[in-house]
Amino acid sequence: PIITKNSTNINIRKVHNDRFDSKKAALVGLKPDLKVSLMPSDLALNCRNLCREYYDLMDNRSAYVNKLQGELRIAFPQYLGIFSKVTINTSLTLLETYTSPSAFLKADKQEIIDIIKSTARFGLTYAQNKYNAIIQAATDANQFGYIIDSNIKRIRLYISFIRKYDEEINSILESLHELVDANEDSDFVKQIHLIETFKGAGFL
């Protein structure tokens, strides 16, 4: 497509008509230094669209992670320091199952340890240490935290959103890898692999 200049720079008029505008566009096309748009290939367009959607989903996910942390700071503040990230699978599974400090304190010890072992896969010692930390955090939260039913509802709601975003983000990453793998011989993919060789540059 032709890149045309703003019509207000050519003539000032109150009434616009097709005859004048078409003539102006034709005159622009006669210029020897005419610039035209460079249309990317379908492969580049697909990669660009998926990358944009990936980062958009990541931004939305981060917003719900912040909301989850905000709720926990009020209802269960000591829980935030137990795991490396509050959004790892073990942490989210525990919060989905019990959510409130009182629920953790009432829960069966072995049940919590089994959940930690099955999701973290670091062994019994790790699971027991995390259990002790959670119980201590729950005990402290009963004294310093403040939780009502709406906090529990929102914590579980935010976790469900985070899990859904994780699912869609992983789906987009899989699609990107499939797209690249299917076009290994193209110059575009070769350029991607070249960029990946730079220190600090990843797949995206």
Feature-to-residue mapping (PLM):
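A detector of single, family-specific signature residues
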Residues: 1-204
